Amino acid sequence: MTANFFTDNADLAYHLDRLDLEEAVTILENGFHNHKQYPGAPRSYADAKDSYRLILSTLGEIAANQIAPLAAEADEVGVQFEDGKVTYAEVTQQGLEQLRQAELMGALLPWEYGGLNLPGTMLQMMIEIVSRADPGLMSIFGLQEISAIIAEHGDQEMKERILPRFAEGTITGAMVLTEPDAGSDLGGVQTRAIYDEETDTWRLRGVKRFITNGNADILLVLARSEDGSNCLLYTSDAADD
């Protein structure tokens, strides 16, 4: 029998069966009218629950049979830093590719951007499944959460340029918060965001440290500006291609 990190987890199955997400899912799915424009959208709450179960089971099978067997090698090889660039271990990249091919990288994103339009509870279950297989890969997979922040607060140009690529899994993200003298106390952040009127550009000055997946393509950087603390979106050269 094929191993599955969802179906063999009684705790996750119990919560999926008993969580009452009907109100939240009804709002997410626009009263279950989204299917008229997006064929993959559920037509009812029962349909949504069936879809969630299938997604979790698919991920559970990938995690157990394709990701977990390579986790030890991922730890042993680790990330590589050469010529100023950080790269994941080859087996970590293989794990990400499996998740991309299964179309599991846009969990929280709306249908219009190619996402799965899942409630946050479902993503947390997905993160638990990946964590069981490979905690390092879980950090990369879980940080797709920042795409939901962009979907909620970004402008339209930003959304159209970035979110479909998150859903495709071709870019990754990170939250850039911690500094040498500001960890859990984010009010102590000293990095500054300075606006350059001549070039119409925001420039960041400061030091960040201990950033999970800090080599990501899309970074949300917490910095001080004249209006207080704000998150600025930084894109790598790869993300701008």
Q: Where would I find each of the regions flagged by the language model?
A:
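Hydrophobic alpha-helical scaffolding
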Residues: T2-F5, Y45, K49-R53, F81-V86, ...
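Short coil/turn segments at secondary-structure boundaries
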Residues: I27-F32, L70-Q80, L109-W111, S139-L143, ...
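Glycine-rich, Trp-frequent "lid" loop and neighboring beta-strands that shape
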Residues: L116, E157-E226
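Extended, charge-enriched "interface" segments that sit outside catalytic cores
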Residues: M1-E82, V86
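Glycine-rich phosphate-binding loops of NTPases
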Residues: C231
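Long, contiguous hydrophobic alpha-helical segments, chiefly transmembrane helices and signal peptides
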Residues: L12, L16, I55-A63, I67, ...
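Conserved small/polar residues in nucleotide/adenosyl-binding loops
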Residues: Y234-A239
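Internal helix-loop-helix
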Residues: G60-E61, E90-E160, P164, E168-G169, ...
